[in-house]
From Swiss-Prot:
It comes from Prochlorococcus marinus (strain SARG / CCMP1375 / SS120). One of its GO terms (molecular function) is magnesium ion binding. NCBIfam families: Obg_CgtA, PRK12297.1, PRK12299.1. This is GTPase Obg. One of its GO terms (cellular component) is cytoplasm. Residues 1-159 form the Obg domain. Residues 160-328 form the OBG-type G domain. It is found in: Cytoplasm. GO terms for biological process: ribosome biogenesis.
Length: 329
């Protein structure tokens, strides 16, 4: 399935039905006169969060969405039927905002949560409303009002407590695959991950915690270079970041600095988010060089480093214990 996490659509609520002009003229109806009914109200446009959806793909080719119009009034003071609401299902984590002003209509994060974004127009009045002592046979009625119309921007921000970040080929997809049941595409070349991957990792209590692995960052990602900037929004909601570093890289310290700079440049308080620095692929270094690298990192601003081998499932218990303790703070 194609992963679409942004969409631009126009929504228009239904127009209210018109009131009508009608009269009761039956000889057996002593209180005859104007009997035109009111028009029905137009239908609303409603968004609803659905935990079974993972993408905004449905809106890629459906860019104008209309709710049903109200029906015109009927004789005998009958009100026309209101238009049906149109309910648009979106993934949990979808933010709905007005495209031109940026005003946020709502943020749908809970399964089943609903949000009315465009209200239908009010139905018009029939001539029965205009009966008076001066006018016993009014011909006046009103038309229904137009429904609200908005140009909207939909943005999906995945709901994950833990985000795994790092440069391409740091081993993020391997890590999430061994920690959870997620099965992302894994290969030994950069940019294997082209979309975010989600995996559920079980705590000792049995509760599940959602982890997100986003495509690798590169220098300049926050300014739009590479793939990672497209998906940094998906770690905005996380409580904890795992900064994964390839311990066997030519310059791991420089790699760390690149990612830290991108977090700072992106904003949204990502640089202040609690995180754990994890050296991966420790199986590719001898013990002496690994210790040397750990000491060098500990001498800087990084107080604690965890070394693992994701592919060999080594050191994962220590990492998970640290994650659970951080999330409980």
């Amino acid at each position: 399935m194609q992963f679409i996490d942004q969409a631009r659509i126009t929504v228009k609520a239904g127009r209210g039905g018109d009131g009508i002009v009608a009269f009761r003229r039956e000889k057996y109806v002593p209180a005859g006169g104007p009997s035109g009914g009111d028009g029905g109200n137009g239908g609303n446009v409603v968004f609803q969060a659905d935990s079974n959806l993972q993408t905004l793909l449905d809106f890629k080719f459906k860019q104008i969405i209309l709710a049903e119009n109200g029906r015109r009034g009927g004789p005998n003071k009958c009100t026309g039927a209101s238009g049906n609401n149109i309910v648009l299902k979106v993934p949990c984590g979808t933010e709905v905002r007005h495209l031109e002003t940026g005003i946020i209509f709502g943020d749908l994060t809970i399964d089943g949560e609903s949000l009315v974004v465009a209200f239908g127009g009010i139905g018009g009045l029939g001539n029965a409303h205009y009966l008076s002592n001066r006018n016993r046979a009014p011909e006046k009625f009103t038309e229904g009002k137009d429904g609200e119309e908005w140009l909207l921007h939909l943005e999906l921000k995945l709901l994950a407590e833990v985000g795994i970040i790092g440069l391409p080929n740091a081993g993020k997809s391997t890590l999430i695959s061994v920690l959870s049941s997620a099965r992302p595409k894994i290969a030994d070349y950069p940019f294997t991950t082209l979309i975010p991957n989600l995996g559920v990792v079980r705590k000792p209590s049995g509760d599940g915690t959602v982890f997100a692995d986003i495509p690798g960052l590169i220098e300049g990602a926050a300014e739009g270079i590479g793939l990672g900037h497209e998906f940094l929004r998906h770690i905005e909601r996380t409580r904890l970041l795992i900064h994964l570093v390839d311990a066997s890289a030519l310059n791991p310290l420089e790699d760390i600095e690149i990612v830290e700079n991108e977090l700072s440049a992106y904003g949204h308080s990502l640089i202040d988010r609690p995180r754990i620095l994890v050296l991966n692929k420790k199986e590719l270094l001898d013990a002496k060089n690994l210790k040397k690298l750990e000491r060098k990192l500990n001498q800087g601003s990084i107080s604690e480093v965890i070394s693992i081998s994701a592919i060999m499932s080594n050191g994962l218990d220590i990492l998970l214990n640290k994650i659970w303790s951080k999330l409980e703070i």
